[in-house]
């Protein structure tokens, strides 16, 4: 929900700076709402006890016993796009392909095909995804849960995290090296409204707290 709220505030700012119509609002908000639906098991017609659909060819991934929805992290973007194409294609006022293309931009690290120059809409959905997560006032408190989600698919090792404390210790570096460049256009739109500036303040507050190693706001360090 925070991602959708961030997307809405980005659109509010954009509307004050450039032409933004009802269709723009609808497609971006719907993309924000459905961008992570692929984590949910059983949403696609081919999902079954034998495995979960992971691509348009119908290939499946069988999850180990005891897995959570987080185990679908490597596939969730493709699953979200498949869900959108299946469920939204019959809605006249929405272009399912447009929504799916915007969701593609939420793949992280960004896919090579997701060129910011081709789709401002996709870039703003990506920014809403990042800002909604990292601008959460409780983001650092959620570090333990996030770490174990990463651990379930081995991503903690890829990112160099050996414990939840590493996630917060390395957060400022991660933000400036991997996040900041992808959200600058959205920051420009957020800076136009008071609610948008609150998102910016939240982002920098989390960086400040991680840098200062404030107690009681995240994993024991």
Pin down the residues of each PLM region.
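Histidine- and acidic-residue-rich, metal-dependent catalytic cores
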Residues: 7, 70-111
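Divalent metal-dependent phosphate-bond-processing catalytic cores, especially two-metal-ion Mg2+/Mn2+ enzymes
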Residues: 9-24, 34, 38-45, 88-93, ...
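Alpha-helical context
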Residues: 10-13, 56-64, 79, 122
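Short acidic, glycine/Ser/Thr-rich loop/turn "cap" segments at secondary-structure junctions
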Residues: 15, 58-72, 84
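Post-HEXXH active-site segment of zinc metalloproteases
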Residues: 43-67
């Amino acid at each position: 929900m925070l991602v959708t709220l961030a997307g809405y505030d980005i659109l509010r700012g954009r509307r004050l700076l450039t032409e933004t119509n009802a269709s723009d609002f609808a497609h971006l908000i719907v993309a924000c709402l459905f961008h992570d639906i692929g984590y949910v098991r059983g949403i696609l017609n081919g999902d079954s006890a034998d495995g979960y659909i992971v691509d348009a060819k119908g290939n499946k991934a069988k999850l180990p016993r005891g897995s959570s929805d987080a185990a679908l992290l490597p596939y969730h973007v493709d699953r979200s796009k498949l869900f959108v194409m299946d469920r939204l294609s019959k809605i006249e006022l929405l272009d399912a392909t447009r929504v799916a293309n915007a969701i593609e931009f939420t793949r992280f690290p960004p896919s090579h095909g997701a060129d910011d120059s081709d789709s401002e809409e996709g870039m703003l959905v990506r920014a809403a995804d990042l800002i909604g997560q990292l601008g959460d006032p409780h983001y650092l408190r959620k570090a333990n849960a996030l770490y174990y989600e990463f651990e379930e698919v081995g991503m903690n090792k890829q990112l160099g995290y050996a414990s939840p404390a590493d996630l917060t210790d390395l957060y400022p570096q991660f933000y400036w090296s991997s996040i900041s460049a992808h959200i600058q256009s959205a920051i420009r739109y957020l800076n136009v409204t008071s609610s948008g500036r609150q998102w910016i303040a939240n982002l920098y507050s989390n960086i400040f707290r991680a840098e200062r190693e404030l107690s009681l706001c995240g994993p024991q360090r």
